[in-house]
């Protein structure tokens, strides 16, 4: 068995496992946060590198991930059922604000979530149209689609899915649900009928991508407030990280990666200062909060071959200054 598989679960191959953990520059007695436990691949590798004085706090909003985390019997390990935007609250509760040596975030939907038809994330398997990361909170995708306006749905598809046929698809979905109400038939409550409706609404097909890919992504991102959560955790990392603490983030689509890249770049440059202004280096650096570490990392060919879902992954790492 490869070392990669040792730290991955049978149902989920952890993407950029060693690269993301190496990005944390682990201290054996450090305090770390795995903001997206999933099935614990990154967490288990981190724990294997910490001494008995090290500490790891893991977070996930998926009840099934929490169940998997509770199987880890380790006094250095603590699991929180929450979203990673709650990191400031969790750190304050545990007395760890400004003491965290590293935060790891593995964004997006996990393989177990995609592969479980009952979760409603996949357009390839028939299941209830749910899409919630935390199934105990909020509206399901089906409930939201039954009440959203055509204009708002088109905006979501365009903004979060970068879908060029957003208006056509939104019109088809809203029309279908309206007709169902009028005729006393069932509205869209399952994944495959939605995927088929989207495919019919799209005039041009991409032979490399299912026509429902962008729409499913957009609806999922909206239902789970994924980009709002990401923006929140990026800023809160500045508060909870210790000096020289690391932020290691894996993203899977351009919207996430763009947000991470721009945030790290902006925080590494600080506020713009007019040229020629006589300032000492410490004054110039005062507004810089992060230092970007290396270049963006993508999976090697061997990893993509073993796990095709890793193809779009991008890892970015930054270090807290001062």
From Swiss-Prot:
Gene3D superfamilies: Putative methyltransferase TM0872, insert domain, Vaccinia Virus protein VP39. GO terms for cellular component: cytoplasm. Signal peptide: none annotated. Its EC number is 2.1.1.199. Keywords: Cytoplasm, Methyltransferase, rRNA processing, S-adenosyl-L-methionine, Transferase. GO terms for biological process: rRNA base methylation. The keyword Protein biosynthesis does not apply. Specifically methylates the N4 position of cytidine in position 1402 (C1402) of 16S rRNA. This is Ribosomal RNA small subunit methyltransferase H. It is an enzyme of class 2 (transferase). Pfam families: Methyltransf_5 (PF01795). The lineage of its organism: Bacteria, Pseudomonadati, Pseudomonadota, Gammaproteobacteria, Pasteurellales. S-adenosyl-L-methionine binds at residues 40-42, 60, 84, 106, 113. The gene is rsmH. Its main location: cytoplasm. It catalyses: cytidine(1402) in 16S rRNA + S-adenosyl-L-methionine = N(4)-methylcytidine(1402) in 16S rRNA + S-adenosyl-L-homocysteine + H(+).
